Amino acid sequence: MGKIIGIDLGTTNSCVAVMEGNQVKVIENSEGARTTPSIIAYMDDNEVLVGAPAKRQSVTNPKNTLFAVKRLIGRRFEEKEVQKDIGLMPYSIIKADNGDAWVEAHGQKLAPPQVSAEVLRKMKKTAEDYLGEPVTEAVITVPAYFNDSQRQATKDAGRIAGLEVKRIINEPTAAALAFGLDKAEKGDRKIAVYDLGGGTFDVSIIEIADVDGEKQFEVLSTNGDTFLGGEDFDQRIIDYIIGEFKKEQGVDLSKDVLALQRLKEAAEKAKIELSSSQQTEINLPYITADASGPKHLNLKITRAKLEALVEDLVERTIEPCRIAIKDAGVKVSDIDDVILVGGQTRMPKVQEKVKEFFGKEPRRDVNPDEAVAVGAAIQGQVLSGDRKDVLLLDVTPLSLGIETLGGVMTKMISKNTTIPTKHSQVYSTADDNQSAVTIKVYQGEREMAAGNKLLGEFNLEGIPPAPRGVPQIEVTFDIDANGILHVGAKDKATGKENKITIKANSGLSEAEIDQMIKDAEANAAEDHKLRELADSRNQGDALVHSTKKALSEYGDKLDAGEKEKIEAALKSLEDVLKDTSADKAAIDAKVEELGKASQKLGEKMYADMQAQAGAAGAAGAAEGAAQGGAQQAADDVVDAEFKEVKKD
């Protein structure tokens, strides 16, 4: 059985790790980096770029470069958060036939799970290259505050990428696993994980206990905001730059997608720099042009200015911390350690606010970019049965219930209930002789159902005629370890039942997922062909270069016929390499042709080298004899070994 890898599928960056024995390995991607930008670019020639290559070309291809897609996953187009993003993103966010938020690139409509699958495929390939074997199973992390639709959509993304998702695990819980297993402290500890990533914010209160030599991680409570993260901090800087430039130059950059993409890059850099310095300069020449000529942007931003711009965003993270502490039934003073996760927690103002709330310095010994992937890899090892000393007890982040008479939300499972869990309740009909009931399932904390997230609905039909209140309908809610809900309803009189895994009126159908898997496999085959073609071209280029060099050095040792034959083969290989439509077979044939034609040239080179080596050997023997005489005279000299001392 292959290894189960751990993937942190982030809004801004993603990371993959695997356990090797008791050691965790965060795997470098093909560019040599331990994290991969969650950016996907769709090119004119149908090529798909993922990660750093996609990020590099984003300025020149803003409409087809997709980033922060995690903010849309499992969301409806009408949601206010999605509507807010429509005005900010350079790419198109569109309404799918089922009412979900999808994106568009090169006129192609794409579901967020389909786009996220490209990042997951890159993570899968990264792990396969390192392990040297196929990888088919993964643990994927999600924000703790993700609802059922978002979790289901993340699972779908894994399937489209060719991965069996063994478990969906909450990001703060994964970070706690990484932290807890790394520490030798015995006894019970309560920790707070404050996770402020690129697009989402979570806080979880977790108790780590030693139970009979086993480390038990029990999530006491969780809270958060799935639409608050580093991207929002970047946006504040972008808005500020646009405002300042408009005041100075009278030009509104918000309507220029190319300028916006450059501003986004500059804002992110400025934010990062201001975590370690007090001031930074944003310098973007030729940002735009008007009738008077090109315009350049030059602006200084201080750390104090940035803090003023984002003050309310940092403040917004504190209320969920308050609620999480209250829901966990603990006091702030009971918290032993505060762990910071997510790149945005590197901002000094964020650290200061966290310290102020929890009354203690956050731990600095957890890598905020890698801890989540490390925890996912540990959970992968637990699920594969290779690790027995860890028990993870997670919770459902939001209450689940059904709509009952008067539009009321009747809770079946309260938030922060340990999962997996199951709950049944008996309900009855609202009207006389009612033959069917519609069960609408909601997730959220509001008293009225309409204020919560509708996860899905289904009918139980064939109820025998009876006065209202007589039929007994048992509704069962079952949440699995992934936090995904399964619902069943049963008429106790007839035994009729109807079971569903909650699939909102949104989400991808099985047929759509299967089609996306097929498309992905076709793309993978196409990518493989492109890679092989590139390898053949590189081999051809290298052979052209080495043959030309050899001809210039040894060509005069060949007779005219041989030389002409090589030159003709060389020209035909160069011609085929210049032809952009040439396929691998055509290039390989010309490479072979030149290889055969150059055989005589190779023989001449080899003979020449041997002759040179022979001459050098003879000269060496003569020199050795001369040195032998000199050695006799030097016999009374003391030998000493010297070592080079390198100074740091």
Swiss-Prot record:
Q: Where in the sequence is Phosphothreonine found?
A: 200
This protein's source sits in the domain of life called: Bacteria
UniProtKB keywords: ATP-binding, Chaperone, Nucleotide-binding, Phosphoprotein, Stress response
Presence of the UniProt keyword tRNA processing in the record: no
Q: Is the keyword NAD in the record?
A: no
What does its record list under induction? By stress conditions e.g. heat shock.
What's a Gene Ontology MF term here? ATP binding
Q: Residues annotated as region Disordered? A: 612-631
Pfam families assigned to the protein according to its UniProt record, in alphabetical order? HSP70
The record's InterPro entries line, in alphabetical order, gives: ATPase_NBD, Chaperone_DnaK, Heat_shock_70_CS, HSP70_C_sf, HSP70_peptide-bd_sf, Hsp_70_fam
UniProt-listed PANTHER family = HEAT SHOCK PROTEIN 70KDA
NCBIfam families associated with the record: PRK00290.1, PRK05183.1, prok_dnaK
Main role?
A: Acts as a chaperone.
Indicate the family of this protein: Belongs to the heat shock protein 70 family.
Q: What is this protein's name?
A: Chaperone protein DnaK
Q: What species is given as this protein's source?
A: Burkholderia multivorans (strain ATCC 17616 / 249)
